[in-house]
């Protein structure tokens, strides 16, 4: 399927000597979030370079709080049976899953607490809005940046997220809309292109 092919291309990029910069393009409902979740899972199951333990981290940036909340909830559904800490950070507040007080659900946490957990590597997947690129957000081992609807974010915002790590993280941008700037980026070699050209079954 197109989704399996996309996942395989992205995971192959992870094995290269230079960081991935890939654009995933597909209509609404074509499975972009599933591809992002599967590749995020591959990342957090890898160890940081030259370390015996620890978790690599993923930052998933959405253009609106509503979309960020939806992606956070999708990730909870995908990973609820696995020992993966997922958090949400937006201008309205912060949440963490799993929760000690809300079995099976997420719990509200303070921004200060979340920043601490992101900095010490306890949070493996951080979903949010442009709040993720504020200077106060420091990752321990940021390995993959996923940007949803990438044409809504400027190049400066992409670079701001990438600069949070000494090693440049992999970049997966996603869009439902083929637009001239996106195509120009691909033509000029800034981003490799993967097309989700078929809908998932069902």
Regions found by a protein language model. Give the residues of each.
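Conserved pre-motif I regulatory segment
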Residues: 1-25
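Conserved SF1/SF2 helicase motif Ia
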Residues: 21, 35-72, 80-84
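Walker B catalytic acidic pair
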Residues: 26, 129-130, 148-149
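P-loop (Walker A) phosphate-binding loop of NTP-binding proteins
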Residues: 27, 63, 176
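Conserved glycine(s) of the Walker
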Residues: 31
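Conserved helix-turn-beta segment of the N-terminal RecA-like "Helicase ATP-binding" lobe
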Residues: 66-109
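Post-DEXD/H (motif II) to motif III coupling segment of the RecA-like Helicase ATP-binding lobe
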Residues: 69-70, 139-144, 149-202
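Conserved motor-coupling elements within RecA-like helicase/translocase cores
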Residues: 92-126, 134-140
